[in-house]
Every structure is written in structure tokens, then in C-alpha cells.
Swiss-Prot record:
<feature type="binding site">
    <location>
        <position position="32"/>
    </location>
    <ligand>
        <name>Zn(2+)</name>
    </ligand>
</feature>
<dbReference type="GO" id="GO:0035595">
    <property type="term" value="F:N-acetylglucosaminylinositol deacetylase activity"/>
</dbReference>
<dbReference type="GO" id="GO:0010125">
    <property type="term" value="P:mycothiol biosynthetic process"/>
</dbReference>
<comment type="function">
    <text>Catalyzes the deacetylation of 1D-myo-inositol 2-acetamido-2-deoxy-alpha-D-glucopyranoside (GlcNAc-Ins) in the mycothiol biosynthesis pathway.</text>
</comment>
<keyword id="KW-0378">Hydrolase</keyword>
<dbReference type="InterPro" id="IPR017810">
    <property type="entry name" value="Mycothiol_biosynthesis_MshB"/>
</dbReference>
<dbReference type="InterPro" id="IPR024078">
    <property type="entry name" value="LmbE-like_dom_sf"/>
</dbReference>
<feature type="binding site">
    <location>
        <position position="162"/>
    </location>
    <ligand>
        <name>Zn(2+)</name>
    </ligand>
</feature>
<keyword id="KW-0862">Zinc</keyword>
<feature type="binding site">
    <location>
        <position position="29"/>
    </location>
    <ligand>
        <name>Zn(2+)</name>
    </ligand>
</feature>
<dbReference type="InterPro" id="IPR003737">
    <property type="entry name" value="GlcNAc_PI_deacetylase-related"/>
</dbReference>
<keyword id="KW-0479">Metal-binding</keyword>
<protein>
    <recommendedName>
        <fullName>1D-myo-inositol 2-acetamido-2-deoxy-alpha-D-glucopyranoside deacetylase</fullName>
        <ecNumber>3.5.1.103</ecNumber>
    </recommendedName>
</protein>
<comment type="similarity">
    <text>Belongs to the MshB deacetylase family.</text>
</comment>
<dbReference type="GO" id="GO:0008270">
    <property type="term" value="F:zinc ion binding"/>
</dbReference>
<dbReference type="Pfam" id="PF02585">
    <property type="entry name" value="PIG-L"/>
</dbReference>
Amino acid sequence: MASRAQRTGGRMILHNDLSGLRVVAVHAHPDDEAITTGGALHHLATRGADVTVVTCTLGEQGEVIGETWQQLVNGDADQLGGFRIHELLSSLRILGASGCFLGGAGRWRDSGMVGDPANDHPRSFVRSGDQAEEQLVEIFTMLRPHLVITYGPDGGYGHPDHIRAHEITHGAAGRVEGIQRILWAVTGRTDLQAGLDAISAVPTGWRAAGDDELACQDRVDFALELDDRAYHAKVESMRAHATQLWIADGGVSDTNPHAAFAEVTDRAAAPVVFALSNLIAQPVMRREHYQLGAGTAFPADAQGPADGLQW
């Protein structure tokens, strides 16, 4: 199956100053595009950039929030990956991005965390070898991105698939001309701590994060301030992944009909609170954080992830 990117829906162009800019984000699983880069992808797309998200697996090893689709998990029906395609398409539509799967949908399987038996599955992404890099070279050659976004060498929090996404991104980028900058999505320690401190009461059944429990970085090379429109798009793209994410703003869905409410003391630091299936309360911050992984440095007055690039 071809890896060709497909347009997933219309988008609203607010400004056209980034027309001609081509951006590719390489992510491990459905929902990563929303959690780590949703604001930047929407920011770029609504300013006219051509934005594509390459997703490497279907996220088959994920747990499920809510009772509705619990039996889709890998230990039961093993149908979660197909369901998450639908969630991803909804998220990309909200962000205004195109999407494709590395090697085609289902070629590579979610490896799970270190030590998970899924590491040994024959289609496990950690076992993808040279083929995955070749597939990404094909995509980069076709799309000719100026800007590429992925994770750092640790994958952000140590997940083997995130680390593998980093490896193939840098390997492929070194073989394709025209890529001017690679960014690594990270979580800035200062903003994260401020957001966690602002959460005064977590929803019933949730818990507060322990000290240093959530992965974060001291080094931030660029922080993107999300305006109201970009922030709203990020939250809604996260909400689209309802099997994986729970937004504590009272919203419900067919997937998760249970409302959750969090209380915060500083809405600038934590306007919205969410949790993964571990039910650890986290802030959706007003800034996204990035490290420069390779290529053109940011100008001192940079306000956008493509500032300083030429196209």
C-alpha cells in the first residue's frame, strides 16, 4: 500500500503568509500529534503551510478510557488500532493537516513499552529495521518538507516507538535534500510545574502527579504561544482521541459518557486539565515547547516554528 499523503478535510486559512511552506510531523501513535504538537500544526496550517502528519503505528497496545470500547484492546478483540484510525482522522481534520501512515495503515504495529510482549511481534515498530527509514525517505522525497517535527533521542518519555520515530526521522532527513530544520517536541519543566501547581482539585478517581513523575525538559529552544484559536483546536483534537484522553471540562462523548471536572487556581497556567488512561491530572498548557534537533537556528525574535527558514 502506498504511503501517499491524503487530504483529510478542509481547513480555514486565516493568513497566507506561510503559503508554500511544507511541514511534516512524524509521530509514533494516533493522539501524539494532538498532545505534543497540535497547537503548532494548527498554527502552521491556518497560516497557509502544507502540513502532513506521518503516523507510524495504529496504537494497538493502548488502553481504553470508558466502558464503551473496552473489549477492543489487544488482549480481547484486538480491534483498537482500526478504531483509532477514526479518532486520528477527526483530530487531523480539526488541525487542518493531511495524514498518512508509514508504509500504509497497519504496516507497523505499536510495540508497547519496554518489556511488553508486543516488542516481539513480527510487525512491531521497534523491529522495523531499514524498511521504515526507506518508507520515510519515500515520503520526504514526495512531500519535500522544509520543516520536520518529531521527538528527541529519548522519545520524550522513553517509549520505544517514539525513540524509533526519532531514529528514522533523522536517518531519512539525512538522505533527502531541502529539510532546513528538525524540531523535537518536548515538555518544558517550568510551564509544566506551574500548570501542575495550579490544579487544586482533581476529578473523582483521578490523582495528582507525583514529584518528577511526568517527563519534562529544562532546555527549551523555542516556545510557541498558542492564541485562543490554536489552543481551542489543540484541545478539540485531543478530545477526538476519546479512547485515550479524558478532558476534565465536563464534556462527554459516545466513547466516554462520564463527565470529569477539575478545579484550578490559575487558568493562565492550566486553562484545561486532562488525563491519559493512567488518570494522572495534567495541564493543557498555553505554550508548546520545542528543542532544535538539527538545522537552521531560530532568530532571536522568533514567534513561529518556521521563523528563519526560506521557501
